[in-house]
Amino acid sequence: MKQRHTIFVIWASVLFCMLCWLHLFVLQQNNGSHDHLVFWEFQVPRLLSAILAGAGLSLSGLLMQNLFENPMAGPYVLGLNSGASLLMALLVLGVAPAFINELSYVGAAMLGAYLAASLMFVVARRVQNVQSLLIIGLMFASFTGAIESVLQSYAAPEQIKQLLIWNMGSLQQMSAAQAPILSGIVLACIGVCLFLVKSLNALVLGELPALQLGIQVKKMRFLVLMLTALLAGSITAFCGPIAFVGLAIPNLARAVLKTQDHLYLILFTVLVGSCFLMAIDALILVLDPWMTLPVNVLTAVVGAPYVAYLMMKKR
């Protein structure tokens, strides 16, 4: 069985390398005199955005599904992106409380994601029904969206434009100078998760068996919550809210691997998540290299039917 899992991870790695090559050397060729500048300042950061956002959101979804013990959990569905978006909006529109004004965009988005995750975790402990939890997540997203709309009605045109562009989700927003920051956050979170594989596997068994195995469940859940908020918040800050990746990819990984071993789940989820967003961005480049089609449009086209299928399958 482990050999089968290893083969899937290897194939995902091969696909990852092929998409990187396709993205850099086939779809984004330039013939001008500034090839070197364009490559390092625009093409590489765009590719890194796809890789890091896909990997981070997928891993965030996997952690949330473990934490909530619910395969329908995800950073977008349960409102983490909405929490991050709200604090980002407060910061951009200049109406944030004083302590939030002291934060960077990344810090504000991370705080919003953490507060949203904490709220949904408390709700999940009281609401055992999957459909009810999803409805509450959607209500929270609608509530934060309504607050943003009210704030925008009093904002300057430039502020509204900045916020709308960011909310559409894009892999072109991150600059070359910002790339090391997001890379460090995502890679560090992946490393910590790989270190916690045994504890994550124990949490799958339930709270009591995990305690009997010597796992400090409360501390572990707090750590998972922090990692989830860090991943979802930082990616939302740099790329805007991106839907369905964190929900669909972990479920796809479980369906393919047919295991709860988080060593293979983490590796496969991270690779497939990166490949998914690289493929989405490649499709945008094929349609029109200069088109600013929001990433959320294509992730919704692919992700929404799969999520609907998952919900019907659970009924």
Predicted regions and their residues:
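Alpha-helical transmembrane segments in inner-membrane proteins
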Residues: 1-315
